Amino acid sequence: MSDHAINEHPSRILNTIEKIRFWKNGLAEELELLFRKQCEDTFTLQAINIEVDTQDENKIEEVRIYLSTPAFDKTILTSACITVRSYYPSQPPIVQLLDEKGGKHKYTSLLLQLWKNERSVFNIYRLVQALIKQDFEREHTSPPELPTKLVNTIEKLKVKEENEAPPVIPAKPFSSSSEQHFRKVPALPSKLPPKPLKITANSSLGQETNSNSSSFQSTLFSLNTAPFSATSQQLVHDSVSLRRPSSNIPAQKPIPPKPEQNEIIITKDTPSLKDKYSKPALLPQKPKVSKGQIVQQVSVFSTGKKIESQSLLNLIDTDIETPLKGSSELLYSEDFKPNVDPVKIQQILHKQNKIIEEKWISQIRISKNLEVKQRLLDQERHALETLAKNIENNRFILGKRRRKAREALQKLDNLKDLSVQELFIIPSERELKYYELKRKDEKLDEGIRALNQALHHESIMPASWLKGIKLLARQQFLIRDEMLQYS
């Protein structure tokens, strides 16, 4: 057989162990223990062979045990070969490590060196335990392979990322009408801070000032880009709400500086934004009736008395001011723009893939361990069933021998009661023939009882029992018929 052993079926390994039992019973028991203790997490028996040593002149038979262990997974080693010769256990076995290319590596350890001094302590199972606990040099290491579905998913994501371009952030829209309407104020250089825009107290925008011209331009942009369904009053209100001061300090009247070139000053004569964008006057609307007035009218109509307490009515009519921002600021504020980081997405994807991979590997390990445990439980159950049958057979044999011993003792007791004359009487030929037929009849009767007990314990099949009973009954009938002639 080649050095690289093929994984044999467990039944074939057990048959080989039974053959070794006729050669060396102690070695067979050690191999049986090794077969029961094997597991995929520790070691696995590949084959047990009985071979002849061709290098020896006497051609002595030897036993070779091939096994593999998870310690060989990331190395060039594939299996270990333990050779047990005829002088075992006085001499230690020979251990060789086999690699992928068919090479052999000698294995030495302290256990093998101390074997001769402590033969009663060391055995093959302890040798295998020392072998699987040793760390071997890891060569040709490679990362663990992912499942095929997960690999395909990751490759698709990589190809998709390479084909897709990075997201383009759209530039802020700008309207040319606002620049033409306000005399095309030229933009200042980016390095210099913008000049403040002065607004007088009599302007249509109220007693409010803005710190820079960029906020004023954003106000004009919100007016030009607002939805068409909104009225001009709402647009002006939204633009003013953007510049509402956070504190309640009354605004002081600013001192108007001298007008400079390219600067706009809004006065009474300057047309206001409200007049520019206002629609023609609508018809006068009817005054709205508040909820409190409706409740008061209903109570007066039903009871005839006016409600004095105005707390509930005041709560109904009161308008609660909320510090909400305008719609234009919510739509075009840079704080609300989505922030997409491709590096962070890659990190999250890698983390999720790693979690999925660990779960799959743990499930595979659990399933394999359960399969090995189930196989070992089946083997133990089969062994227990065989042991129970052997115990029943031994009980049956012991009972049979006990009955024979009891009958022999009874015969001895009967002989003790006989006199000397009766003991030394020489029987005739007729009597001897009768006694011989009687002994045969007793033996056939014992055989019939044994068959009945075996059928009761389900040790034999009913067809075999019926065949045996017919044969014994026929012989017993013939013997008893012959006994009648000599009686």
From Swiss-Prot:
- Which terms under GO biological process does the entry name? cytoplasm to vacuole targeting by the NVT pathway; endocytosis; late endosome to vacuole transport; protein transport to vacuole involved in ubiquitin-dependent protein catabolic process via the multivesicular body sorting pathway
Where does it sit, as one GO cellular component term? nuclear envelope
Out of the domains of life, which is the source?
A: Eukaryota
Q: How does it sit in the membrane?
A: Peripheral membrane protein
SUPFAM superfamilies registered for this protein in UniProt: Endosomal sorting complex assembly domain
Would I find Zinc among this entry's keywords? Answer: no
Keywords on this record? Cytoplasm, Endosome, Membrane, Protein transport, Transport
Q: What is its main location?
A: cytoplasm
The cellular location(s) given in this protein's UniProt record come to: Cytoplasm; Endosome; Late endosome membrane
Under the heading Pfam families, the entry gives: Vps23_core (PF09454)
Q: Residue limits of the SB domain? A: 428-487
PROSITE patterns, per database record: SB
* Role this protein plays: Component of the ESCRT-I complex, a regulator of vesicular trafficking process. Binds to ubiquitinated cargo proteins and is required for the sorting of endocytic ubiquitinated cargos into multivesicular bodies (MVBs). Mediates the association to the ESCRT-0 complex.
Describe, as the record does, how this protein assembles with itself and its partners. Answer: Component of the ESCRT-I complex (endosomal sorting complex required for transport I).
What this protein is called in its record is ESCRT-I complex subunit vps23
Please name the source species. Schizosaccharomyces pombe (strain 972 / ATCC 24843) (Fission yeast)
